[in-house]
């Protein structure tokens, strides 16, 4: 039996959550959403998703803290989705343990390709 790949979206902007959620749902991913960092961290530990899509600019905490805390115990793929476009910020996120970094705005095909790549690399 085929099991859907589970993706946790940690993003506070509803329109972006809806866009990503509908895109992933239509491509047979199981989607869970958290609108803040606290809920996101709780869902990472309780639901153990196959992949996390993470915004850095959350209302209650910086996404960098979520990366660091998750990396203390897990190697699950984390793809940052952020409006932060400075090279320094991208490098910091990748060095903290993010597997990839996509800047907003982004296209559907790029997002799906990066998810497939992260899952493929994690399964090796």
Give, region by region, the residue ranges found by the protein language model.
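N-terminal/domain-start alpha-helical segments
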Residues: 1-123
């Amino acid at each position: 039996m085929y099991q859907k790949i589970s993706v946790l979206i940690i993003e506070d902007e509803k329109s972006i959550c809806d866009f990503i959620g509908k895109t992933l749902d239509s491509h047979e991913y199981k989607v869970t959403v958290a609108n803040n960092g606290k809920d996101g961290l709780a869902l990472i530990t309780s639901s153990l998703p196959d992949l996390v899509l993470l915004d850095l600019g959350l209302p209650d905490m910086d996404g960098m803290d979520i990366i660091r805390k998750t990396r203390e115990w897990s190697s699950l793929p984390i793809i940052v989705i952020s409006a932060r476009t400075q090279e320094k910020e991208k490098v910091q996120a990748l060095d903290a343990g993010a597997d990839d970094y996509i800047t907003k705005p982004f296209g559907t095909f790029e997002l799906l390709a990066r998810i497939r790549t992260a899952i493929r690399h994690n399964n090796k």
